Design a protein with these regions (language model features):
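FMN-binding flavodoxin-like domain, especially the glycine-rich phosphate-binding loop
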Residues: 1-100, 159-178
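Residues that cap or flank secondary-structure elements
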Residues: 6-7, 102, 112, 139
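Acidic, Ser/Thr-rich low-complexity intrinsically disordered segments
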Residues: 84-126, 130
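Iron-sulfur cluster-binding cysteine motifs and their immediate structural context
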Residues: 109, 115, 119-136, 140-142, ...
């Protein structure tokens, strides 16, 4: 699992269960820090060289265990997290610790910067940005930030006050590097 320097919550246990439902068996699990989708500050510059060494060592250990004991010998991998029903979704709060609802927040477009290249629509994992008019969000936005981070002209941004307050809280609390 990769997470943005806050927490991976039940991500690994959920992934293990999804794999099992599809007939796959987990042979190892780890969580690594990567740049958070909301911010270039949270987990910025990660994974770094040290992270990559740790990941490579982890992968080598898994391969060695499989080569020595065979895939059939692998037992159930115990992972952190709350078994189904999982612990629920992360509850966003603002800087005053009040609960905020950012589900309907969508990216805005600075028309003075946008040249209509459509890269934001191509990068949108949900297909939420209209390909013919990339200023329009016509589907469900999951706030992954791909449109913002990949826009070559810096035209995409979030301006919702609750979202920005939540982002400020995350950057205040979770900027220190985690290993």
């Amino acid at each position: 699992a990769v997470y943005g320097n806050r927490a991976y919550d039940d991500g690994i246990i959920e992934l293990r269960e999804i794999m099992a439902e599809d007939g796959l068996r987990l042979v190892g699990a780890a969580a690594f820090v990567g740049e958070h989708t909301f911010s270039r500050i949270l987990g910025g510059g990660r994974p770094d060289g040290e992270d990559l060494v740790i990941a490579e060592e982890f992968a080598s250990e898994i391969v060695q265990n499989l080569l020595l004991s065979g895939a059939g010998a692998a037992g159930r991998v115990e992972v952190p997290g709350t078994p189904y029903p999982y612990s629920g979704f992360y509850k966003a709060t603002d800087t005053s610790k009040k609960s905020v609802d950012i589900r309907k927040v969508v990216p805005q477009t600075d028309l003075t910067k946008c040249d209509g290249c459509g890269l934001c629509a191509k990068m949108c994992a949900m297909g939420a940005i209209d390909f013919t008019d990339c200023t329009q969000v016509v589907g469900k936005c999951i706030k992954c930030g791909a449109c913002i981070k990949r826009c070559p002209r810096g035209a995409k941004y979030f301006d919702d006050p609750q979202y920005l307050s939540h982002l400020a809280l995350l950057e205040e609390k979770f900027t220190s590097p985690r290993r």
